[in-house]
């Protein structure tokens, strides 16, 4: 653990508050006309996902947990959870479905991901920005329907719904942003 002043806390930092780990969602410094400047920190408890909001004086000391980011390869999912392997040491880590959240829909076997590790336990996952998936179903194009929205609904091979341009048909491979599930481009493979 490293003690840092509250004003230096940034999004993505992991803080140790009363023995529990929290990931910082937002951190804003406020300087009111009168009074002491404060840092407003919105955090999510890693153990159970509860969101909390704390105010610290900007000079107050907070404990930042030492978190190591390491590349791992996604192996498989079973009843125990999602299994990842460090390609250098061949050590395996397991993350629960709750820890991964909505990102689990984009995990593919053999995919390289970044895991945030604290004391040997994976606490957060960062997927590649884009993944390539196949369109399983989409609505047919109605000729001359250009006055309305230029995107149509589609279902991806992982079951996620997204919007795609009218020229995309079922069976087409497309690049999808993992952050929000939006269409990026047609795959070039």
From Swiss-Prot:
Q: Name one GO cellular component term.
A: cytoplasm
| Superkingdom assignment | Bacteria
GN (gene name): efp
- Note the Pfam families from the entry: EFP, EFP_N, Elong-fact-P_C
What is the purpose of this protein?
A: Involved in peptide bond synthesis. Stimulates efficient translation and peptide-bond synthesis on native or reconstituted 70S ribosomes in vitro. Probably functions indirectly by altering the affinity of the ribosome for aminoacyl-tRNA, thus increasing their reactivity as acceptors for peptidyl transferase.
Question: Which compartments is it annotated to reside in?
Answer: Cytoplasm
Q: Name one GO biological process term.
A: peptide biosynthetic process
- What's a Gene Ontology MF term here? translation elongation factor activity
Which protein, by its recorded name, is this?
Answer: Elongation factor P
Q: In which pathway does it act?
A: Protein biosynthesis; polypeptide chain elongation
Entry keyword annotation includes Protein biosynthesis: yes
* Annotated family: Belongs to the elongation factor P family.
Q: Which UniProt keywords apply?
A: Cytoplasm, Elongation factor, Protein biosynthesis
